[in-house]
Each structure stands twice: as C-alpha cells, then as structure tokens.
C-alpha cells in the first residue's frame, strides 16, 4: 500500500473532522468550514464528505488538504503524522 491507501484505510472522514475541530452532530452532520455555514449542511460519511450548501466534496485527504490549504500529498503526510 502507498501513503494515500494507508491513510484512507486507517482514518475516517469523521475522525479527521473531529480531530481538526469540526463539531459533528446527529446524522454525521457538521457546519461546513468552507463557507459561512450556521446550520449543519456537511454530511460526513465513512469514506467521503459532501456539503449540501456549497458542494464541497472529497475524501479524508481532500478534507484535510482544504482545511489546511495543503497539497494532497502534504495532507496525507499530516494525517499519517497525526494519526
């Protein structure tokens, strides 16, 4: 397995979101950090997230990359280090 596969096998989107400060509520919903969100509109599934408000979507690496303005490789490294 490569770095990307390893990270995706170990870390769920919800785990990363909570670790990086997103408050995840009922139904795995959270306020989206990518737009001015006041009510939860981001669905966090096991393997991917989707925001019904702004359309942001991706996997755990994509979420981390967007949260910290990193490349996918840098985000995968950060996840490997943090988890």
Model-derived segments and spans:
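N-terminal structured subdomain of primase-like DNA metabolism proteins
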Residues: 1-83
